[in-house]
């Protein structure tokens, strides 16, 4: 049997077909690899171009001449501003075309060109990082329902702090000035700081918390500067509440003393008095101070106009102790039949913090015996333990608040 010429050619073609298919697949892999390399190189090129642009901008900034920093005294007209530059003096300068005259306000920091003294940039206010850290970013989750036995104090602080912030028009209608500040005083553990947290939660204001000891600084003038910057920050974030805990550390009565440390503390208090007189109550800045030694505070700090209301926090009575017990035992796993009133009767003279400590100690007794519930006996043993600590306290402090 003989094959024709056409059949022979088709047989040869069928033999080369797998070879060409393999070759095409190899070339496709090479093309895909080259394309991937090209995309990678393009990404690297874009990244390098971005770095080049950034370095060019940085080089341009480095080549720019330095600017004078001044403070605006007042705008003169649409194109002129009176600026104070230390130590040269005051100058009337022109505005750069990029600066809006409406953004230029008195006491703001500005940058002036080195040669022409043209105002070309508005700078942010200078605030110490230690002062900026005093601002509480997260609003405390304490509420008035978590404060037991202080109904009268809650009503008074609402009138002084919460009402002016939320409804200032009521004071305008009556024609009376808004209160500036309030002093919370009483023995330790009676709920002063807890109530301040609740006020911050309900007013939805910027809450700035500072301890009096933080304002006592090593170098002369540092404490006064921190007080000034504290109120500057409060104005910028108004409405705001400044809570000063342990105010007796800087607000004690002034005495004749040759000590440099005492003089610096007195200067800090004088700056605080100046700020309390200087800022207007209508700016929605309220001051809450707390202390457990009102007897040593300076009379100048306590006068009306600076501290408009003084709220006493006495030790809780039996009903108040019962309310505090109910609040702190609300989430505890208690056995049935626990008589909380009897437990409150066993703690005469106890503070709110000690009542909370009784609940914690009762839970610890239950844990010690591997139980998941708290009994009446646990509470009674906790009362005995906590009140025993109370009886060993310094008698002079107890005598002070008798």
Swiss-Prot record:
Binding locations of ATP: 186-193
GO cellular component: cytoplasm; nucleus; proteasome complex
Keywords: ATP-binding, Cytoplasm, Nucleotide-binding, Nucleus, Proteasome
Pfam families: AAA (PF00004), AAA_lid_3 (PF17862), Prot_ATP_ID_OB_C (PF16450)
Highest taxon above the source species: Eukaryota
Cellular compartments annotated: Cytoplasm; Nucleus
PROSITE patterns from the UniProt entry: AAA
Keyword DNA-binding: no
InterPro entries for the chain: 26S_Proteasome_ATPase (IPR050221), AAA+_ATPase (IPR003593), AAA_lid_3 (IPR041569), ATPase_AAA_core (IPR003959), ATPase_AAA_CS (IPR003960), NA-bd_OB-fold (IPR012340), P-loop_NTPase (IPR027417), Prot_ATP_ID_OB_2nd (IPR032501)
Main location as per UniProt: cytoplasm
SUPFAM superfamilies per record: P-loop containing nucleoside triphosphate hydrolases
Keyword Transcription regulation applies: no
Any one GO MF annotation of this record: ATP hydrolysis activity
Primary role: The 26S proteasome is involved in the ATP-dependent degradation of ubiquitinated proteins. The regulatory (or ATPase) complex confers ATP dependency and substrate specificity to the 26S complex.
UniProt record similarity statement: Belongs to the AAA ATPase family.
PANTHER family: 26S PROTEASOME REGULATORY SUBUNIT
Name of the protein this chain belongs to: 26S proteasome regulatory subunit 8
Organism, scientific name: Manduca sexta
